[in-house]
Amino acid sequence: MFGNRNDERLPLQRALEAAASLKPGSWESVESLAVLAIECKGTPEAEQLYQTASRAAAQLKAGTYDAVRALAWLSRAGRELHAVSGRGGEP
């Protein structure tokens, strides 16, 4: 699934590549992108990952466990990325 076992790239680079292959709008993609946004905090990619996750979340079916979990991670990512501005998770 993740390619060559002898891959010398950093885990974050491999995670970003793996996340790009997830189905857009799936709970897996929202959760993965939100976690990656937190991990990339302080980099230009962090906000882009967060925004992509936010757009994907708009397609999630409400009321499922998977949606709740993904949206909770998205909320945490927003809180962590936007804490300084006081926007509390809202883009």
Regions inferred by a protein language model and the residue ranges of each:
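Short, charge/polar-rich alpha-helical segments
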Residues: 3-5, 38-41
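Short, charged, intrinsically disordered terminal tails
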Residues: 2, 79-91
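TPR/TPR-like alpha-solenoid repeats
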Residues: 36-39, 74-77, 81-84
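Amphipathic alpha-helical repeat scaffolds
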Residues: 16-20, 34, 38, 54, ...
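Helix-turn-helix repeat elements of alpha-solenoid scaffolds
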Residues: 5-12, 46-49
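Amphipathic alpha-helical elements of HEAT/ARM-like alpha-solenoid repeat scaffolds that form extended
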Residues: 28-36, 66-75
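Charged, low-complexity interaction regions
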Residues: 20-29, 41-45, 58-68, 85
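Tetratricopeptide repeat
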Residues: 14-15, 49-53, 74
